[in-house]
Amino acid sequence: MTNEEKLIAEIDSAGLSAEMLESMPSPEMFPLIIVNLQGRIAELEARETEMLARVDTLIARLAHLGVA
């Protein structure tokens, strides 16, 4: 089995369609994609921190009211 045949078999076994393969970015785009993903992760982490602070504030308010 040639390398090309092995690759085709691997793609087939992974269930990747030709459309999916055609829509995949080129390897040259990977660094940009990684930077964009890192930025998005940082945004989500900041939102998570903000939400946790809000939860802490709500818990403190409830405790002050004698509910928590």
UniProtKB/Swiss-Prot annotation:
Residues 34-63 form a coiled coil. Keywords: Coiled coil. It comes from the Viruses. PRD1 virions are composed of a tail-less icosahedral capsid of diameter 63 nm, an inner protein-lipid membrane, and a dsDNA genome which is located inside the lipid vesicle. The DNA is packaged into a preformed procapsid. The internal membrane plays an active role in DNA delivery to the host cell by forming a tubular structure used for injecting the DNA into the host cytoplasm. Assembly protein. This is Protein P33. It comes from Enterobacteria phage PRD1 (Bacteriophage PRD1). The gene is XXXIII.
